Curated annotation (Swiss-Prot):
Keywords: Cobalamin biosynthesis, Methyltransferase, S-adenosyl-L-methionine, Transferase. Its EC number is 2.1.1.133. It comes from Sinorhizobium sp. One of its GO terms (molecular function) is precorrin-4 C11-methyltransferase activity. This is Precorrin-4 C(11)-methyltransferase. The keyword tRNA processing does not apply. It catalyses: precorrin-4 + S-adenosyl-L-methionine = precorrin-5 + S-adenosyl-L-homocysteine.
């Protein structure tokens, strides 16, 4: 018996990986967070599968589901939104599984920041403008941020910031980053990336709070901050330079 942790992607059901889809189809038990994982993914479950919405459940209750499935010899598909590597809360589940000696696998998914960048129609790394992307958040109810991991510390690098789980703290974002990036620095907020009701709010650190106040956003939003978001007059990379192609890629005769 194995618990398969599966990154279910940012929202749209057709953005799940082929491996993730196939694993769902092979598992007689499926656990998913109904509050953030698309119910359309459940159509990949095999007939008669036991489907459990973990949204209202505690970690102890989820652990009990794993133990029950292990006793029955049933593989479990455990769906988490986005990708498992960041803010998935799988670490504490894995610790519980290891306590019981239950095997597990991890299958990556399309992360929310990638879907949000697609919604913007932008590459996030622009030659000579922005070559680093920081994925971060602010302190919240689920867990505090380490003292050294502040918006100000990351903003001091000048990198493009992808700030997750922070729409409730937009004013804090503006206040901490404006002295570092300037009031005219581009900001883009992507709400429910890849979902049918996806929307984008664009502005600057100087006016984004007022724009959001006109159309309030409650949750499931990602805030991008950085000059690369609007850069158009930038140098081209050497990737397609003929000399680069000859040396590193090879060229057909």
């Amino acid at each position: 018996m194995t618990v398969h942790f599966i990154g279910a992607g940012p929202g749209a059901a057709d953005l799940i990986t082929v491996r993730g889809r196939d694993l769902i189809g092979r598992c007689p038990v499926c656990l998913y967070a109904g509050s953030i994982v698309s119910p359309e993914l459940l159509r990949y479950c095999p007939p008669g599968a036991r489907i459990v919405d973990t949204a209202p459940m505690s970690l102890d209750e989820i652990e009990a589901e794993y133990v029950k499935a292990e006793a029955e010899g049933l593989d479990v598909a455990r769906l988490h939104s986005g990708d498992l590597s960041v803010w998935s809360a799988v670490a504490e589940q894995i610790r519980r599984l290891e306590k019981h000696g239950i095997a597990y696998t991890m299958t990556p998914g399309v992360p929310s920041f990638a879907a949000a960048a697609s919604a913007l129609g932008r590459e996030l790394t622009i030659p000579a403008v922005a070559q680093s992307l920081v994925l971060t958040r602010v302190s919240g109810r689920a867990s505090p941020m380490p003292n050294s991991e502040t918006l100000s510390a990351f903003g001091a690098t000048g990198s493009t910031l992808a700030i997750h789980l922070a729409i409730h703290a937009l004013q804090q974002v503006v206040e901490e980053l404006t002295p570092l990036y300037g009031a005219d620095c581009p900001v883009a907020i992507v709400v429910k990336a890849s979902w049918p009701d996806e929307r984008v709010v664009r502005g600057t650190l100087g006016d984004i709070a007022a724009k959001v106040a006109e159309e309030p956003i409650e949750r499931t939003a990602l805030i991008f901050v950085g000059p690369g978001l609007e850069a158009s007059d930038f140098r081209e990379s050497s990737l397609y330079d003929p000399a680069y192609q000859r040396r590193f890629r090879g060229r057909g005769e």
